[in-house]
Amino acid sequence: MKKYHLFTLLFLSMLTSSAIGQAYDYCDTKTLKDSCKDYIDKPYKYDASNIILVTLQKKAQMKEVELPMFMGESYKLIFNTYALPPGVEIHVYNKDADHDNRKELFSCNSSGAKKMFVFDTEHFHSKLYVDYVIPANRAAADGSMPTVQGCAVMVVAYK
């Protein structure tokens, strides 16, 4: 019985690690994250990072990430969009998508030549919301839908 449980546990862990490895095959997140850290200069210190995996679908998508902040602290958000497909927009807001009166604090786009973006928070908020607006996948000339994937890395630093 113990061998059965051990075998099952081993099989599940291999299956899980295989699935995780496949999810990141198209995205070298460590390299992207390390390049973001190069933009952290004193007196800022590394706090956290976020990886967003993107697969273009038939319809446009929006993914929102909530960032809790400490009131009175200054933050720096560093975005690396080298591995994003063209057309993905990144917007930073003071409120979530459910609020009509939210204010856009920062935005950038993955389509241009510039791929590294830095946002220094001069406003003190308890939370920031990062919205990734992902365009719809366009069909190829033969009508097939090619798989378009990518990722972005956001690093948060505080002062």
Task: Tell what function each PLM region has.
Residues 49-53, 98-107:
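Surface-exposed loop/edge segments in extracytoplasmic proteins
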Residues 74, 85-89, 150-151:
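Exposed beta-strand and adjacent loop surfaces of beta-rich binding modules
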Residues 22-43, 123-159:
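C-terminal edge strands of extracellular/lumenal beta-sandwich accessory domains
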Residues 110-125:
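Beta-sandwich interaction modules
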Residues 48-70, 74:
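Non-catalytic, beta-strand-enriched accessory regions in extracellular/secretory proteins
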Residues 4-15:
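Sec-dependent N-terminal signal peptides
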Residues 64-67, 73-82, 130-132:
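Hydrophobic beta-strand segments within beta-rich accessory/binding domains
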Residues 84-99:
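Short, surface-exposed beta-strand/strand-loop-strand elements in extracellular ectodomains
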